[in-house]
Amino acid sequence: MQTVLENPELSVEQRVQYIQQAYERTKDKTDILVPRSAADIEKIEEDGTLKYKWPKFLGFNPGYTAIGEGTALPAQMDRYGHAGGNNFCSIPEAGAYTFLQRALPYLENSAAYHAWSFNGDTYLAKIEAVRQQDWNGLNGLLASEGLAPVGEAECIRLTKAYENYLRTVREKIGADFSAPYGVTGTVASAFGSDGGADQWTMPLSAALMEKLGILY
């Protein structure tokens, strides 16, 4: 598939059609997300990476806010896609938001859906420890919850992930917007969908937040 994506002699439409056909033939669709339409793709990079026409401001409607002490954190979160991502939706009492409310450019795939409970009690303290690179403090929090400590390699991963998050916020929202603990708001309309879901962009990925006992 990657060879086809990297082939500049094929149009974007041809390459997307190939991806969709390969997806339909795939039996195990776990965490596979493929484009719904070639019209949603800005370009295909030389290495075959798909660059979508994502809306501005990390996909938030105007009115997004920085997560902080006064934020009502969700009891549950979910997302479509692998655990390396850091964009989530809360889960309302009435049930999860629809694919259209999330305004995603992919074919809907239930095998790519994941949901977690969210531990808000120590969330801010854990993110602050990562922010300050206070690994003793972080490990103290983890120990208080019966979780394994983070080692040197994990500390490096946490630092890089957090720095990447801050860089993304600066690039996509602006250097004057401070959101050390994440951003929350509603999903902007995009890809032919109205959006409207309650969205959370967190400093760490799902996988890292699982490690820290934030998601479980």
Residue ranges and their predicted role:
Residues 2-17:
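Extracellular, luminal, or virion-exposed ectodomains of exported proteins
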Residues 13-216:
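Catalytic toxin/effector domains delivered as secreted proteins or via bacterial secretion systems
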